[in-house]
Amino acid sequence: MGQKIHPLGFRVGITKKHQSVWFARFHKHQYAQSVLEDRFLRKNLLKLLPQLFQKKLNNSPNMPKISHIQIVRGLIPYEIGIQIHAQNCHMIKSAFEGLEVQPNFVHNLLKNHLILEKNSVKKTSLFKNAGENIELSLTAESTNDFDSTEKKRGGLNRKGEQSLNFKNSTKKTMKSNVEKRKKLFARFHQRFLGKFIVVKNGKKITKKFDSKKQLSFKNNLLSFFKKNLQERRTFRKNKFQTSFSKSSGFSKNQKNRETISLKQKAFLNFVDSKVSKANLSKPCTKFVNFYMSQTNLSFLNALKAEMNYWNQYFENSKTEEIQKFGSFRYLPLGSQKKWNLLRFKRFEKLPLPLLLKLFKALQQKALKKLERLRKEYLVFGKFSKTKTFSYYQRVRFLQNLKKFISLRKNQNSLNFSQSTFENSAQKTTNQKFALKVASLTEKSFQKKFSKIHEEKNTIKFIDHLQALVQQHRSKNLFLYLATISESRQNLKKIQQFTKQQSDFLFGISPKTLVGLTNEEKQEILKNKVSKTFFKISQKNASQKKNFQDIFVEQLQKQRTICEKNIQLTPKISIQFYSVKAQDFQTRASAVADSIVDDLEKRKAFRGVIKKAKEDLMRTPKVKGVKIQVSGRLNGAEIARSEWVRAGRVPLQTLRANIDYCYKTAQTIYGIIGVKVWIYKGYTKTRKPTANSPSVLLDLL
């Protein structure tokens, strides 16, 4: 017969089941344990839930029907989320009451029941007090505002005088800092930036090197020592005497020459060399500068003429359209859609910083475009009409965008000023809104606490599932050895960290514990730790928590996770999703279940498949169906597969919304496999919104 591969990854020997070998790679991402656990949970849930429904409801028409069970896993391996999609979800929780549980779980259940009842009593009292406090605060704040206005009219307190003195001192320090910065900038300008001149050509600003200005002594000295030794010697013999006699105020005797330092000699020599070089290069630089200035002027004049031409062209086309149609309908010929001004309607929803970024990016692109036009003009001496027209459109769009941003800024400033005036009125409205929220939350909590019995049943069911998973993990312990070792290592690290940072976390310094007995140390540690945890538990979500509180909470969570992983106990959460009757009929799992029931009742498979297909095609949402049945059909000796299709079922398109289910029917003749595909149209692709980046990509 050979070997078959199990869908989960087992290589199963048909004759020798004890020789089944695991061959898939499961060391990464703990794939083995998650797949086995999911399969195990799904099997148990599909067995257990129908039994509970029959006990409670006894085949009544309101009995909940499960469409499918989804198991979701988070990043943390011990967390398991179970999503049950079914009809009449409110009946499922009541059905958990008939679950037979071990006596150990009953003790935990009673504890949980007491905790829930206590919380219900506390929460109702808290919400009543909160409503009274908010009403009192409304009256108190009105009186406080009146008192504050009277204090402002009267004289200043001591605190006010101190604040004025502090403000004056801060102003003085600010002025001194500004003066210091100015001096530093002036020194920097003298030393380093003195050799550059800022030149403005139209709207373009550039920096040019000024050859007339003196170089710094350091640069001269470096360039001097780069010369050869022979050149230096000849340079000193020829130039030193003349330069020294003209510039220095010393005597011409040999004694004074010997006393002068080498640095001074080098400086004097290079001043003369610089003057001589400047005199030689003056005519060349003058010619180049004059030629470039003339070409730039001619380029700017030509570009202005082109821009004026295109501006007149736009105005003429606009007037013609207004005369014909009575409004400006169409852009002139050759204009691009992306530079259309109607685009600003989309920009209304965009935030202001994003618009500023867009403006800067477009400005840089426009400068690059201008540089290309200048190069083309230098080479050919003319402009291409299409390029100048595109540049004109870009510049026109930029000008309008600048105006649009300025308008947005003015609107924001006006809104801000209005909000400051309306703050007092907003406070009262906010407080009224808070009262409404408090009343609504109170009602919601009352609903929840009225259904404590159902919550108790769900806790019982979760405990039962946790016990089942723990048994499964203990059987397959070889798959969980790596997680256990990792969690032990993490626990040790957490313990070391808490010991090192005990002063920051709990306020326990090792110096205070010196010289005490072990019993006294334990008592002090217990008291400090219990106090910190009590403070953290008292703080609600509305109150702001310190960095210390958040750190302690996270450490406690990590510790519990590690301990649970070592004990092989998972954290299971159950969520119920109600499914409508129309949606339930078009689910592949429900259709497969109905086919399996009919086949197990020994009905003819062709009639069953045909009926299921016709019923599905009558529903409006379904656009295609395919049903396949394989096995010993109608008790035939040779197994075969038969399938029926209606409409379209595109199995290779990714956008197709196809619901699929596979189930087995256990008949007298053997197992019959049932596969159902239901095609419900294509999934909707999202259109680009105003906030999406695809709106701005074509501009850049």
From Swiss-Prot:
GO MF terms, alphabetically ordered: RNA binding; structural constituent of ribosome
InterPro entries assigned: KH_sf_prok-type, Ribosomal_S3_C_sf, Ribosomal_uS3_bac-typ, Ribosomal_uS3_C, Ribosomal_uS3_CS
GO biological process: translation
One Pfam family cited in the UniProt record for this chain: Ribosomal_S3_C
Positions of the UniProt region annotated as Insert: 88-196, 282-587
Main location: plastid
Disulphide bond pairs: none
Localization, UniProt: Plastid, Chloroplast
Keyword Plastid (UniProt): yes
Keyword rRNA processing on entry: no
Family stated for the protein in its record: Belongs to the universal ribosomal protein uS3 family.
Subunit record text: Part of the 30S ribosomal subunit.
NCBIfam families xref list: rpsC_bact
Protein name (Swiss-Prot/TrEMBL): Small ribosomal subunit protein uS3c
Annotated organism of origin: Tetradesmus obliquus (Green alga)
